[in-house]
Design a protein with these regions (language model features):
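An exposed, glycine/acidic-rich loop-and-rim segment of catalytic or binding clefts
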Residues: 1-215
Length: 215
């Protein structure tokens, strides 16, 4: 194989600010994915979040971590450390949240992201990174990912409703277009018009339950 840059991104902060894609390879918080109807309950109290995706709150709200300017420092020649303090009540979430993210590119050609967070009040949190991959390389991108093969060590997936909220079920992938236990081209079954889940997600936009041995 060839060495290539496979993660899409921006060259400077002005391109980030003016990007039409608000989540392109950005940090996501305080809560990645959707929260139904922009509300949640915690210890008997209900919290209300900004609605920014149909009837739901997505990726931390209208001004989530993806639009924040983080403090940055080099830890060594392999790691970049990012810091951000989310104030109490920011985007409707409880507690002040101090977040540290460490990007590491090591000698084994691994890119590792570590997330650390500390709050002064009970809250909910689901940090992630919204990387956009172009596996053929940024310099020579493929027009679609339909021909790329995917393999997932997962016997189950989580179905969603028509607004992309998990239904609470955990279903078997066997016999469905969601079965990637053996390598399959992504585009082979993505246009299955008879599959309600593919319609709900406009393709694959689901969580998988990865198989993992008990430690």
């Amino acid at each position: 194989g060839n060495y290539a840059n496979v993660i899409q991104g921006h060259d400077n902060i002005n391109d980030v600010i003016n990007s039409p894609e608000p989540y392109l390879s950005r940090l996501i918080g305080r809560y990645g994915n959707r929260i139904a109807n922009g509300r949640f309950q915690l210890h008997g109290k209900e919290y209300y979040l900004p609605i920014n995706n149909g009837p739901n709150s997505l990726h931390g709200g209208k001004k989530g971590f993806n639009v924040k300017v983080w403090d940055a420092e080099l830890m060594n020649n392999q790691s970049l450390v990012l810091h951000y303090v989310s104030s109490y009540g920011e985007e409707g979430f409880s507690g002040e949240l101090k977040t540290t993210v460490i990007y590491t590119f090591n000698d084994d050609n691994e890119f590792i992201i570590d997330y650390l967070a500390c709050t002064n009040k009970k809250t909910i949190i689901n940090l992630t990174h919204h990387a956009f991959f172009s596996l053929a390389g940024i310099a020579n991108p493929t027009p679609t990912i339909d021909t790329l093969e995917c393999e997932l060590n997962a016997d189950f997936y989580i179905p969603i409703d028509e607004t992309s909220i998990p239904t609470g079920e955990i279903l078997k992938v066997e016999g469905t277009p969601f079965d990637f236990r053996k390598p399959v081209a992504i585009g082979k079954r993505i246009n299955d018009d008879d599959n309600e889940q593919l319609k709900n997600g406009s393709g694959y936009d689901h969580c998988y339950v990865l198989n993992k041995k008990e430690e």
